[in-house]
Amino acid sequence: MGIKTALPAAELGLYSLVLSGALAYAGRGLLEASQDGAHRKAFRESVRPGWEYIGRKMDVADFEWVMWFTSFRNVIIFALSGHVLFAKLCTMVAPKLRSWMYAVYGALAVMGTMGPWYLLLLLGHCVGLYVASLLGQPWLCLGLGLASLASFKMDPLISWQSGFVTGTFDLQEVLFHGGSSFTVLRCTSFALESCAHPDRHYSLADLLKYNFYLPFFFFGPIMTFDRFHAQVSQVEPVRREGELWHIRAQAGLSVVAIMAVDIFFHFFYILTIPSDLKFANRLPDSALAGLAYSNLVYDWVKAAVLFGVVNTVACLDHLDPPQPPKCITALYVFAETHFDRGINDWLCKYVYNHIGGEHSAVIPELAATVATFAITTLWLGPCDIVYLWSFLNCFGLNFELWMQKLAEWGPLARIEASLSVQMSRRVRALFGAMNFWAIIMYNLVSLNSLKFTELVARRLLLTGFPQTTLSILFVTYCGVQLVKERERTLALEEEQKQDKEKPE
């Protein structure tokens, strides 16, 4: 079935009406549950005073989000504003030294935040992978990179290396793991690109400029070295038409998203409710499904805000960073499921595509996904819940290929060929709806807890069968059809754009 297959406008209107009504109904259930549970003893630690003048408390269960926009807000603004200011001055006065300014400012910021010994620790890892790159053996560079990453994820080395951080503060562990892990991935990218292009003679200075670019340092996203080096080496970068307007719009959207999350957390305690399973079990089925869905949406919003702020600064520096992740609402295939495009690009370039090739053969695809999720497990930090998450998502990615091969099998292919293109789209959307909930359940394991995931699965699939199960499946089907319609519109717009660009 082609992506350009259209459905009747009345049918799409019905889907929109059903989806809007279902979301409103689930939202009302969550709002009532949040109001009822605001004063529960189990909520005292994570539901704190908020808008007292209207009697609303605030969900503060996400430690990182609260720290970013309270105690560390001014530090973040000061550090990024200083970076933008010095970058602008350097671009005006000495554009050839622009990349050096990025590295020096970033290194000083890291040293001021984490201490000089931590900076020396990272320099040691950088030098180690630089030396490995001189040998020109990709397998050695990747192996050493993974060993370095493991040293930041497993005891006793992680405990020893964390001792290099000076002082103690709230976000110390988050910054330590973020800065260290991203440093290893960047250094590994540098080493692999050096092996792939020995004629370019990359230097240690190039690696340091790449690694200590402050906006990307602690939280990413990660750009592969070849892309970063090509963009940052432009002596006189030129902005595209309308680029500044796009940067301002991106910054504005980030501010709006931050305000929206703040407002949302005063009315919906979506992060706190799952911690009290007895209370969560009393929710209506629709509200429970909405709670599971909203947990993934929030994680996407959190990533989009983080990368939106960082990418705004990077765009001011004339870089083209990885875009924020695709909204979870638009994901109904495992192949597009990722919450960090930078890490996804890194894994695809150096592992997944290298092993899987065209991703059309079952055995190479299985090997590629196993290798990719093995590295992802190491990146996230090996533990039981991460093992389970990796297994489920690895299975989901391969299961999609198996189903695709099955659909291409003679009898099934002939059955689909006998259907109209509209009916084929409807059948595929039905499978997409089931896949959508598989994505939610598989990722809810790591974003929340295994017990909460078991509760959702039991209520929606067992005790709620068939009424709840089929109702939620139909609502999801409506959503998938609307996503497909959006994809169809974008494909047509892209085709028209390409036609206009063709010489007459």
Swiss-Prot record:
Keywords from the named record: Endoplasmic reticulum, Membrane, Transmembrane, Transmembrane helix
UniProt-annotated location(s): Endoplasmic reticulum membrane
Domain of life from the UniProt record: Eukaryota
GO cellular component, one term: endoplasmic reticulum membrane
InterPro entries associated with the record: MB_O-acyltransferase (IPR051085), MBOAT_fam (IPR004299)
Transmembrane segments: 12-31, 65-87, 100-122, 127-149, 251-273, 288-310, 429-446, 461-483
Membrane topology type: Multi-pass membrane protein
Tissue: Heart-specific.
Entry annotated with the keyword DNA damage: no
Gene Ontology biological-process annotations: negative regulation of N-terminal protein palmitoylation
Subunit structure: Interacts with SHH.
Function description: Negatively regulates N-terminal palmitoylation of SHH by HHAT/SKN.
PANTHER family: ACYLTRANSFERASE, PROTEIN-CYSTEINE N-PALMITOYLTRANSFERASE HHAT-LIKE PROTEIN
Family: Belongs to the membrane-bound acyltransferase family. HHAT subfamily.
Protein name, entry field: Protein-cysteine N-palmitoyltransferase HHAT-like protein
